[in-house]
């Protein structure tokens, strides 16, 4: 795996340049999952967890891309998104050529590339793909899809960190090890994340950015830009169920929002979800153990909303421990996220009618 400037890549690949087929990022044979913007031949996105699938013939695939800051990625070659990616790497340049696969055998292959860090770490743009063989039509979306709306827990803040007192590092943030990805893998579902660290329903962490909370950010096409707004017609998927895991930051730093404000904003978020996907789409509202009042706040919002197919649950104090299950800054590590997923998976099964199979959560 290598990341090179376009000039250096051109020099290294000069002998093979005539053999490459260049395919624009916007080609319909390439499948993107998550909120993205197509601008001409480019495709841009900044939300955690957005991923693309490319099927191709031949031994080689590279991507021409750029990033506004320093985004990290997970890569899989010829396999599904397992907990352990084949490789992880950073894109920290405006014009970069990343070799995704080389030296493969003859025949069809597939790569999956997932953005593992959140929007504050950078906005990623795919320009084109270089291959020696033909780009093939993507295999198609999975029959199941889950949308997760959340904060740093959903982003994967600190999931790869070794200790709860470790500081945040972008390279240890990995959305693929969160309860969301674990749940999607268990059900064999595609998934997308609408998540941002520090976000609350009515109050963000330490009251940062007052008046601008997840019910507002949820409407955006990009995590870090208030415009343009996202429309359901922009996505090629409709979730079978939506999960909200928010409220921890509302009760952060020893403070809490007024219940009426929390309830109003929560209902607004629920109404946005129902407007996007229809009244029959089930929504699961999860509360952490951050504060004993959080569950009551969520239950009140769901009840007062009067909306159909909305359920609520809480992750109890004993779902995970404060030692071995914690990563950076007291956020759950992979072990902790497995335990959170194990709490919610039965609810998802009941809401959707999906069977619970006898297999591990991973």
Model region roles, listed by residue range:
Residues 8-149, 153-175, 353-362:
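N-terminal secretory targeting modules
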Residues 145, 190, 280-282:
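Residues at the starts of beta-strands that form the adenosine-phosphate
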Residues 78, 216-361:
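Alpha-helical cap/lid subdomain in secreted, periplasmic
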Residues 148, 191-193, 312-314:
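Conserved beta-strand scaffold positions in the cores of enzyme catalytic domains, especially
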Residues 49, 116-121, 159, 165-260, ...:
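Conserved SGNH/GDSL esterase-like catalytic core that processes O-acyl groups on lipids
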Residues 33, 194-196, 286, 315-316:
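Conserved beta-strand termini and adjacent loop/short-helix elements that scaffold enzyme active sites
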Residues 1-5:
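Bacterial N-terminal signal peptides
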């Amino acid at each position: 795996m290598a990341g090179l400037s376009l000039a250096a890549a051109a020099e290294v690949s000069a002998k093979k340049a005539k053999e490459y087929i260049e395919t624009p990022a916007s080609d319909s044979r390439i499948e993107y999952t998550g909120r993205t913007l197509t601008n001409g031949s480019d495709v841009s996105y900044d939300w955690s967890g957005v991923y693309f699938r490319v099927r191709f013939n031949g031994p080689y695939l590279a991507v021409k891309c750029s990033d506004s800051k320093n985004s990290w990625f997970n890569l899989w070659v010829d396999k599904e998104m397992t907990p352990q990616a084949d490789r992880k790497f950073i894109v920290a340049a405006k014009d970069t050529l990343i070799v995704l696969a080389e030296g493969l055998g003859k025949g069809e292959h597939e790569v999956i590339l997932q953005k593992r860090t959140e929007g504050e770490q950078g906005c990623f743009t795919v320009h084109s793909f270089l291959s020696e063989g033909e780009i093939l039509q993507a295999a198609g979306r999975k029959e199941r899809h889950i949308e997760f709306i959340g904060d740093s827990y959903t982003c994967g803040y600190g999931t790869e960190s070794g200790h709860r007192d470790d500081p945040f590092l972008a390279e240890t943030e990995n959305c693929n090890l969160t309860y969301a990805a674990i749940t999607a893998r268990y059900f064999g579902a595609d998934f997308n994340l609408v998540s941002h660290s520090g976000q609350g329903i009515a109050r963000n962490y330490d009251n940062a950015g007052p008046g601008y909370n997840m019910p507002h950010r949820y409407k955006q096409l990009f995590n870090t830009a208030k415009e343009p707004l996202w429309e359901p017609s922009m996505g090629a998927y409709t979730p079978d169920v939506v999960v909200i895991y928010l409220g921890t930051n509302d009760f952060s730093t020893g403070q809490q929002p007024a219940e009426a404000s929390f309830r109003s904003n929560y209902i607004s978020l629920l109404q946005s979800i129902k407007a996007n996907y229809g009244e029959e789409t089930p929504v699961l509202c999860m509360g952490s153990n951050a504060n004993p009042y959080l569950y009551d706040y969520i239950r009140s919002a769901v009840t007062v909303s009067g909306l159909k197919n909305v359920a609520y649950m809480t992750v109890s104090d004993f779902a995970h421990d404060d030692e071995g299950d914690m990563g950076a800054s007291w956020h759950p590590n992979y072990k902790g996220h497995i335990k959170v997923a194990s709490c919610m998976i039965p609810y998802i099964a009941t809401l959707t009618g999906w069977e619970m199979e006898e297999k591990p959560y991973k």
